[in-house]
Design a protein with these regions (language model features):
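A cross-kingdom marker for long, charged
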Residues: 13-78, 85-132, 136-392
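N-terminal export signals
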Residues: 1-12
Length: 392
């Protein structure tokens, strides 16, 4: 693995040795995760081990990606030659699949902590052009809460606001495929572009804690609507519907199934099917899906929701955990074209502060959004593009 660990701290000799040893351990853990996670070629998340064909087509979306392309070119122009060599990858590179939520993962590209103020603003310009205002602010708040975690955990070396890396895959183009990846603790964005089409999955957003009650960013709080709207969805079901939707009323651990290096998970539909809901409940489920999709820019959110709507009847809602106002829980929304997971996780970096470190908590949340059936990272669109336009 070619990436280096960025260390934003000045050490004494013994402290420096400890950090060096830890960095080497993290490098080895990262390499092992990659070797195991990338052992199989990409297929995509499926319900039965086989990709459902013809779900995704190369077709004009009617929403311009020129602002994203211009912002990417501005960011690239801001980098030095050395930085550029670390940041640029081919569009079909395995780098797309090299992401992990954990803070120890050794990442590729250039970190925000290494950037000048101008470079960092150019990076944020790329993100603002690609995301909705809501999506950008959520991502920034994940970063801010990683600073809060650094304060609480006493670890400014491997945790912090600027320990997030950016890579560019392919050359920004109006016609050729390209994209970018943003990667760090509790925030991973994969953003693929082909013409005016966009695929923004896998997407991972989370935090521990989800609310800052002290420190530099006191008052920052995230993922409450995702939590509350999911709970509202299950509470609004009839008793009979709830019995079908809830897979287990007991939640004892972490339940997400499609996080890092889980690109080929076989995950059958479970829970309650939207076709069996009332119109009002189906609209509520759609609004829950849109809450996640709308982290993308507004125009491409509409395009993706049109795709979601075409499969709304075959969209499933599943639940694990209690359904009370203070319950910890997991829910999943799954259709042929979208997969969303929300999970209250066990304490991790803050386990020593927890009354029960083995019990899932509302202060540690993981959210994942995927495009099943082979189009995570825009892989199916890229496949179709190469069939139509063979590359050397």
């Amino acid at each position: 693995m070619a990436a280096a660990v960025f260390v934003p701290h000045v050490f004494g000799q013994s402290e420096k040795q400890t950090s060096t040893d830890l960095a080497e351990r993290f490098r080895q853990m990262s390499e092992q995760a990659e070797q195991e996670g990338l052992a199989s070629p990409f297929l995509g998340i499926t319900t039965n081990g086989k990709v459902t064909p013809d779900l995704f087509q190369i077709s004009p979306s009617g929403v311009s990606t020129e602002p994203v392309r211009n912002a990417a070119e501005k960011f690239i122009a801001s980098l030095t030659g050395v930085q550029l060599a670390r940041t640029m990858f081919p569009v079909d590179d395995a780098q797309w699949r090299k992401w992990m939520n954990q803070h120890f993962y050794v990442r590729q590209g250039i970190s925000l902590g290494e950037m000048t103020d101008a470079q960092r603003e150019a990076a944020f310009g790329l993100m603002r052009a690609s995301l909705s205002a809501k999506g950008f602010e959520l991502t920034r708040n994940v970063m801010r809460l990683n600073e809060t975690l650094a304060e609480l955990a006493g670890d400014p070396v491997f945790l912090g606001e600027w320990l997030y890396w950016i890579t560019i895959l392919g050359k920004p183009s109006a016609t050729e495929p390209w994209g970018w990846q943003f990667s760090g603790h509790h925030a991973i964005i994969n953003y693929f572009v082909l013409g005016d089409q966009v695929v923004m999955t896998p997407l991972f957003l989370g935090s521990e804690p989800v609310r800052a009650t002290s420190g530099k960013y006191k008052g920052v709080e995230i993922l409450q609507q995702e939590q509350n709207d999911g709970l509202g969805m299950v509470q609004a079901l009839t008793d009979a519907q709830r019995q079908r939707a809830v897979l287990n009323f007991s939640k004892t651990g972490n339940n997400n199934l499609t996080e890092a290096f889980k690109d080929n998970v076989v995950l059958d539909y479970a829970g309650l099917r939207a076709k069996d809901l009332t119109d009002a409940a189906r609209r509520r489920l759609r609004e829950l899906v849109q809450l996640y999709v709308s982290n993308m820019d507004d125009g491409h959110t509409r395009v993706k929701m049109d795709e979601v709507d075409r499969h709304i009847g075959n969209t499933w809602f599943a639940w694990i955990g209690g359904t009370q106002a203070d319950s910890a829980f997991y829910y999943r929304v799954q259709s042929p074209v979208i997969l969303i997971e929300f999970d209250h996780q066990r304490p991790a970096n803050l386990a020593r502060f927890a009354s029960d470190p083995d019990k899932p908590t509302r202060q540690h949340i993981h959210c994942v959004v995927r495009t099943p059936n082979g189009n995570d990272y825009g892989k199916d669109l890229l496949r179709q593009h190469y069939l139509a336009h063979p590359h050397a």
